[in-house]
Amino acid sequence: MKKNTFIYVLLILFSSFYSCKENTSDDSEKLAALLLLTQTQQQTPEVSPCKDRFAIDQVGIYNAKEIISASAHTGTGFQDSHCAVDGVLGLGNFNGSLDVFTLDTSGSGASLILGWNGKKVQNTAGTDFIVFENPFQQGGNPNSVFLEPVIVEVGNDQTNWCGWNPVYNGGGAFSTDPANWLRFAGLRYVDYNQITNPMNSVSLFNMGGGDGFDLGDANFGNSGTGCSAALRADFQNNGFLYVKLTSAKVILPALPIPGANENPDIDGVIAKQVN
């Protein structure tokens, strides 16, 4: 395990890289490698980068601020689950946010369950909630993204879950094209930043990035442990309490996801309406 000073140097390098490359796509593959290296090494830093931040709600923007289950949590660095509920801090097309909670590649730590403090996310017109991870474009090509696929499910009791029947169409090799990952999260880069690029609800749900999910989608309820037609109807009519985010390969082990893309980094989840 590396010294904390090494981690701080890496973070400084990240900051410098962002400053120089903010509006370009050159060397994005190097950024992917540096992001992975930093997250791999930053296991026990003394200070969490997220501990003093909090999510900002407004009409039509309701952050999941309740941590129900986060087995990968250690309280430090990218293993601080507070980073998943302290507000979304996206960095645009070419940069992955460091304000994230990294999931494990196996076991209970490969999942994160969040809630809205007893309120239910409602079925509205269009997208009902957005999952924000930290993907970014590689080589200036929107069809080549550093992505870490996430399977999204919702529930009321932490036992029975309904999902969106995610499907991979990329064949036997790992694809960096988001179009090959249907109904997964962790695909779309994030423009919304509650501090540097705030938006109202309409803008956020149309152009803020992240991956949106709709309870009215025809695929909703076609996957998930314990999901039934009755449970799906209940979610659609009355809403849900919890959202569960899981590293895709844990649920679908046949997916050709390499090690560098196995453990997603969660920036947050935002709902359009809660009650």
Language-model features and meaning:
Residues 2-11:
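Sec-dependent signal peptide recognition
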